Amino acid sequence: MRVARLLLCAVVATALSTTLVAQPAATGYHSVACFKAKPDSGAELRKFLTEESHKIAQGRVDTGLITTWYLLRAVLPQGSSAECDYLIVVMFPGAPHMLSQEDLTAAIKKEGLSFTAEDYVKRRNAVSTLVSVGIFQNLVLVGSAKKGDYFQVNYMKVPNVDDWVAYEKKVWKPLAEAMVKDGKADGWSLNVRVLPNGSEQPFQAVTVDVFPSWDSIFAADPQFVDRFRKVHPDMELGTTFEQFEKLRTRAQINLYELEDVITATK
């Protein structure tokens, strides 16, 4: 799961600062919204997302519309050429849905806020551009994330999604579980794109490697080979990763930091 994997192959309650976040459902749906700060509005956008958007998300969690809300800040790439400065990831308890004005108004009322839904949208649009929104299906979730973790998001071009998903579940899922158990990582997830979709899209699926710190992203893992052999005693390392290369192409890798999180209590 860390840089070693790249070499062998050639990414809720009130915000939590140190304790682990309750694990979202392993299967289901989530949305990913990409926001770009308007010129000279980076600080204002961060304040808006961590304050007003956080309160709205808390209201949506409290009313049961969503189960988890993540605010991810772009680490690499960043700057004017980066597509997203922030991602907001929302986990749903059932079928996915877009935030309607009625839902927004209900969340505002639930939290006892003084502004209206129209005020909220105007403030958001004054400091940011909503670049895109996508819907994904969660297929596998290993471990859990905490505030301050780093998310390595691996965007995959996958000709045959079923074959690739089956191989990831067979090979990488047990490895990810072992690395979480050994304290080498905080989590891993496997997700397929639902909408938008089609052959012209730049990627069809995403895996996310969750690291506990910046240094852990680049730290060597001398036990990786032994861990692989323990988990897969009947598989050969080289040919196993060669098969990964046949099943998918890593179109892009981005790095984000988990800045804020809300999850429903159980």
Description of each model-found segment:
Residues 7-18:
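Bacterial N-terminal signal peptides
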Residues 22-114, 119-266:
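Short S/T/G/P-rich N-terminal loop/turn motif that feeds into the first structured element of a domain
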Residues 1-5:
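Positively charged n-region of N-terminal signal peptides that target proteins for export
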Residues 6-9, 252-254:
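General helical structural elements
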